[in-house]
């Protein structure tokens, strides 16, 4: 059992690192996480030069969970800007290989756009990912992962993708419960809005695939 209190934003600036794992409670969890609550907003951004940052995993509770993650809640908004080529982000967990059950997310999960337009003064700050797996509970549920509950595994936070890198290879997998689902999902509830209004980071016509679930 553990709790992080709100009031400040956990801000991570990634300048180098092929992979990064960021969570309100723990970055990478090999063991079990039980009865934890995160109340801190989480904001991550990265250096997109070359492969300085390729994979960014982020979750309100855990960035990556290999063991069981149960009975936990997230109340802190998650935001990813100028992010790595891959962003895997969820209200509870970025990517899960184990059992995730009886979890609740009430916070927003977003990849925001440039408020000044795609070619505005803040263009570099809002340079989006090429591949986005984003969900209200889990960004990615791996093939050995299980997400379940008795109606008490819920998401009520909005999931929003506003910015992607311009590329014909861009893929957006977004859902109120899970972004990319490879494992088993059962008895989960989503009441949060899911919105994809992505613009290319540079001008021109955007070409990307959208896969929605939940």
Q: What residues fall within each predicted segment?
A:
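Predominantly extracellular/luminal carbohydrate-interaction, adhesion, and secreted-enzyme modules
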Residues: 1-214
């Amino acid at each position: 059992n553990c709790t992080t209190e709100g009031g400040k934003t956990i801000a991570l600036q990634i300048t180098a690192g092929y992979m990064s794992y960021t969570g309100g409670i723990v970055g990478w969890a090999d063991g079990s996480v039980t009865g934890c609550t995160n109340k801190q907003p989480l904001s991550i951004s990265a250096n997109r030069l070359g492969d300085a940052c390729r994979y960014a995993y982020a979750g309100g509770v855990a960035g990556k969970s290999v063991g069981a993650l149960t009975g936990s809640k997230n109340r802190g908004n998650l935001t990813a800007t100028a992010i790595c080529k891959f962003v895997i982000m969820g209200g509870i967990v970025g990517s899960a290989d184990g059992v995730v059950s009886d979890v609740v997310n009430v916070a927003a999960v977003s990849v925001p756009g440039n408020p000044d337009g795609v070619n505005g003064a803040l263009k570099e700050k809002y340079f989006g990912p090429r591949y986005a797996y984003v969900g209200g509970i889990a960004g990615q549920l791996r093939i050995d992962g299980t997400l379940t509950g008795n109606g008490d595994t819920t998401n009520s936070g909005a999931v929003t993708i506003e910015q992607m890198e311009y590329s014909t290879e861009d893929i957006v997998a977004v859902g109120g419960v899970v972004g990319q689902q490879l494992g088993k999902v059962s008895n989960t509830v989503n009441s949060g809005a899911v919105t994809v209004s992505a613009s290319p980071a540079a001008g021109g016509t955007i070409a990307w695939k959208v896969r929605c679930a939940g």
